[in-house]
Amino acid sequence: MIKMPRGTQDILPQDSAKWRYIENRLHTLMELYNYKEIRTPIFESTELFARGVGDSTDVVQKEMYTFKDKGDRSLTLRPEGTAAVVRSYIEHKMQGEPNQPIKLYYNGPMFRYERKQKGRYRQFNQFGVEAIGAENPSIDAEILAMVMHIYESFGLKHLKLVINSIGDSESRKEYNEALVKHFEPVIDTFCSDCQSRLHTNPMRILDCKIDRDKEAVKNAPRITDYLNNDSKSYYEQVKLHLDNLNISYVEDPNLVRGLDYYTHTAFELMIDNPEYDGAITTLCGGGRYNGLLQLLDGPDETGIGFALSIERLLMALDEEGISLDVSEDFDLFVVTMGEDADRYAVKLINDLRRNGIKVDKDYLNRKIKGQMKQADRLNAKYTVVIGDQELENNEIGVKNMISGESENVQLDELVNYFKSRKEV
């Protein structure tokens, strides 16, 4: 038997309704904030992620699904969404549009070759938001407010917003030099990844899952001590907006995020529930990226965004015992007796569906009792039984499955009968 690839999942019908519910809620919330949907290819040029995400990141070095096409071009299944959205922004010259900043959101599968664990898949679904074309603390605050709005709208509690500033390029240069000086004497005691990052991306040592509890990490210089005046001012204004919005947050000077393009504001939304086992601690993450557009040969413009995992959102809802109202009303089940009735029912249900009525029938030649059980399984509001007598009399009994009451209706009026009930 051929099975699904390791690190993937089948979303079965009983679960796909939850996915649709979440995605519809997210689409609705985006309309409130005036964000428009963008759809980019599932695969892109490998160079896009090597340059945009960063050569020294785990994503580029270890996790990308890269292949050569028949034209010997190197392509990669997208591991994240921001680089592709920025590429599209540049390619289609959106910077020339009058409605700046350009507010975009996306939703779709991403691919990373990660070790299988709870809450992580090699194909995972990511919903993300990007606001490009404005460097203003208020748009950072809007993004953070949106993150809280999304998760609170599902009824989640135990949320902890963690923020930091990693400054501009000047601040980061000074900070990286301080980190190299701090870690160099003890780097031999760190993992091989940290050793390779020391001179390429020393900030990532602070984020290492293996060594982050070491004393050298706990005592490392703090980015906030190296922020220049502009970076400090920007960060303080973001926090003032959050205070004004009554959004609680925790500052973590070691929060650096895993991708190279972040500047200034960086953040994660965590689940802060002591009953969790820690496997799905981070629900969402993002930040500002002021140099990414130029890095990809675009204009000197800035952006900010975030991404969340639908899988982790579903797990968090399950952990907190929050059920989604995904019950689906089904209008009518047609029970048939005999070939003539079945032939009539095929045309009838086609007419009903063309008029917006959710309707189904039996296709396995079940007896009446079996067909009625199928109607119950579908939670059909109504059933009708069509046999030779009903066809001869041009009249049918419509049974309300909730009240148990029945009403006789002319067969040729059945479509109008159900249309009138849908419109109420």
UniProtKB/Swiss-Prot annotation:
Gene3D superfamilies: Anticodon-binding domain, Bira Bifunctional Protein, Domain 2. GO terms for molecular function: ATP binding; catalytic activity, acting on a protein; histidine-tRNA ligase activity; transferase activity. Keywords: Aminoacyl-tRNA synthetase, ATP-binding, Cytoplasm, Ligase, Nucleotide-binding, Protein biosynthesis. GO terms for cellular component: cytoplasm. It is found in: Cytoplasm. GO terms for biological process: histidyl-tRNA aminoacylation. Pfam families: HGTP_anticodon, tRNA-synt_His. Belongs to the class-II aminoacyl-tRNA synthetase family. This is Histidine--tRNA ligase. It comes from Staphylococcus epidermidis (strain ATCC 35984 / DSM 28319 / BCRC 17069 / CCUG 31568 / BM 3577 / RP62A).
